[in-house]
Amino acid sequence: MIASVRGEVLEIALDHAVIESAGVGYRVNATPATLGGLQRGTEARLVTAMIVREDSMTLYGFPDSESKELFGLLQTVSGVGPRLAMATLAVLEPEALRSALAEGNVTALTRVPGIGKRGAERMVVELRDKVDAVGSTSGAVPLGAGGGGSVRDQIVEALVGLGFPAKQAEQATDSVLAEAPESTTSSALRSALSLLGKTR
């Protein structure tokens, strides 16, 4: 099992980064906030979780152990897999997620694409007593510029990948870019996620 990866950041996309360690490039899936804290050409270290399936082995990266533990905890809920767990961490930062679960805040949880009212209620019931076991040690991860290409297209693609309908993703992206046309891809993506969360 690969518990962490440290090395030079070779590539940063909207849903993953490639980090070279000992001559091997590891593709690590991560949230926009985590990816925004990386910089191409510099050394980085991510705590990782490896998900092994019959036809794939996928690495998920996190800035700290707390986020990784929450990722694992979310998957103990029936119907929540790695993709939905990552979408949850993309919309709700660890402290906000812990608070939502501890307080039974179903509204906050349903901001995540793919989580309806019943799913949110199930998460609260199953995880409310477990979130206290997960520490609260991390700070916010700073955001940075993303890769090339059309910023709008990259953001829409990332939002659709997280489970938002294409039309909603396009509307949120257009709204964010109209207000702040000079935004970097990462900051615009965070703003679009925030906007979509409020309108759900």
Swiss-Prot record:
Gene source species: Rhodococcus opacus (strain B4)
Keyword DNA damage: yes
Region (Domain II): 64-142
Highest classification ranks of the organism: Bacteria, Bacillati, Actinomycetota, Actinomycetes, Mycobacteriales
Keywords, alphabetical: Cytoplasm, DNA damage, DNA recombination, DNA repair, DNA-binding
Region called Domain III, residue ranges: 147-200
Protein name: Holliday junction branch migration complex subunit RuvA
Principal location class: cytoplasm
GO cellular component: cytoplasm; Holliday junction helicase complex; Holliday junction resolvase complex
GO biological process: DNA recombination; DNA repair
Function according to Swiss-Prot or TrEMBL: The RuvA-RuvB-RuvC complex processes Holliday junction (HJ) DNA during genetic recombination and DNA repair, while the RuvA-RuvB complex plays an important role in the rescue of blocked DNA replication forks via replication fork reversal (RFR). RuvA specifically binds to HJ cruciform DNA, conferring on it an open structure. The RuvB hexamer acts as an ATP-dependent pump, pulling dsDNA into and through the RuvAB complex. HJ branch migration allows RuvC to scan DNA until it finds its consensus sequence, where it cleaves and resolves the cruciform DNA.
SUPFAM superfamilies reported for this sequence: DNA helicase RuvA subunit, C-terminal domain, Nucleic acid-binding proteins, RuvA domain 2-like
Gene from which the chain derives: ruvA
